[in-house]
Amino acid sequence: EDVLRLSRGMSYKNAIADLEMGGGKSVIIGDSRTQKTPELFAAFGRAVDTLGGTYYAAEDVGVSVDDVAEARKVTPYVLGLNDGPEASGDPSPVTAEGVYRSTLVVARRLWNQDDLTGLTVALQGVGHVGGYLADKLHAAGARLVLTDVNEELLAEVAARTNAGIVAPDAIYDVKADIYAPCALGATLNARTLDRLTVRAVVGAANNQLATPEIGEALFARGVLYAPDYVINGGGIINVASELRARKAGGAYDPAWVETKLARLMETLEEILERSVTERLPTHQIAAVIAEARIEAAVGRRAARRQAG
């Protein structure tokens, strides 16, 4: 069920980012800290290969660029590689950049300021994306309170960002302005909702809302929720550039990525504004836009097939 939710989220994420791709998700059941082997990712690569290019895999939670490189030895249908002219590398920094820019959009809207000076961010998860995001938020003047189950990594990120540290479950009780979930999904749920005192939720995790009703409850309480699949689309934009270059026989194009990322911020601005004018939760507005773009993309593809 969780994987199906993730795949639906990827479909919406790709549509919101104006990428004419469907969405899918694959999951390897196991402990990424103790059970990863080259043989495991070779087996994963063979499974992906059976789909014949209808699905491409890439780095995500618990999976590194090196892991993807192992799968690449047995299938061409992986992205986010470090070698070759089309290679886009680790998508995490670009995902973090999109979430960071989204945080600035929210700061301008709620606090009328262009940086994060004086704001406290409770950031959950300092792994791939969260660590990069912590650096960016710190540089913009935010005070950070961090948590992660990886205590060694947590201490490292906290030291370089002058951040406070709390136990994993205590992050919801931090007196903060912004909650930034950057680990696993569904942390916005019936158990955590009443504990949050923030004015905004802006984070990189997928499927942050345990149910749509949680999004409605946030809206009713005046908490601005930046929809996850909108603001964390930088990574998929980055790997889409690799796929685009590979199919055209060209090279990775950072200018194309930047154009898409800027457009993503325009879409976020539209969602936030429509939420105010239409008096609807942001996740509902985002879904309407995503579904409209999916429908338009399907129509364009059908027209091309008919013309061809």
Regions found by a protein language model. Name each.
Residues 4-7, 38-49, 69-72, 96-104, ...:
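Predominant activation on well-ordered alpha-helical scaffold segments within soluble catalytic domains
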Residues 118, 151-231:
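Rossmann-like adenosine-cofactor binding region
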Residues 14-19, 54-60, 111-120, 168, ...:
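Flexible, glycine/charged-enriched surface loops at secondary-structure junctions
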